[in-house]
Amino acid sequence: MENSKVMKDIEVANLLEEVQEDELNEVLGAKKKSGVIPTVSHDCHMNSFQFVFTCCS
């Protein structure tokens, strides 16, 4: 069991090495203006999304 977890961690680390910094910034939204994500209704700050997804954990 422990060995399979180590192998999985190594796989994930190898996948992250293949991602370029620019690609990562685009996926995470770091290139957006000041952390604001435009939506249909209004601009939501990333902190709002983080609160919604982590408030009940």
Curated annotation (Swiss-Prot):
A GO cellular component annotated for this chain's UniProt record is: extracellular region
Modification after translation (UniProt): Maturation of lantibiotics involves the enzymatic conversion of Thr, and Ser into dehydrated AA and the formation of thioether bonds with cysteine. This is followed by membrane translocation and cleavage of the modified precursor.
The domain of life is Bacteria
InterPro entries, alphabetized = Lantibiotic_typ-A_Lactobact (IPR007682)
Q: State its location(s).
A: Secreted
Q: Which GO terms describe its molecular function?
A: signaling receptor binding
Q: Where is this cross-link: Lanthionine (Ser-Cys)?
A: S41-C55, S48-C56
Pfam entry (one): L_biotic_typeA
Positions of the pro-segment in this chain? 1-30
Task: Write down which residues bear the modification named 2,3-didehydrobutyrine.
Answer: T54
Principal cellular location given in the protein's record: secreted
Q: What does this protein do?
A: Lanthionine-containing peptide antibiotic (lantibiotic) active on Gram-positive bacteria, such as Lactobacillus sakei, Leuconostoc mesenteroides and Pediococcus pentosaceus. The bactericidal activity of lantibiotics is based on depolarization of energized bacterial cytoplasmic membranes, initiated by the formation of aqueous transmembrane pores.
Q: What is this protein called?
A: Lantibiotic nukacin
Annotated organism of origin = Staphylococcus warneri
What does the entry give for GO biological process? Answer: defense response to bacterium; killing of cells of another organism
Task: Give the record's family classification.
Answer: Belongs to the type A lantibiotic family.
Keyword vocabulary terms for this entry: Antibiotic, Antimicrobial, Bacteriocin, Lantibiotic, Plasmid, Secreted, Thioether bond
Beta-methyllanthionine (Thr-Cys) cross-link, renumbered residues: T39-C44
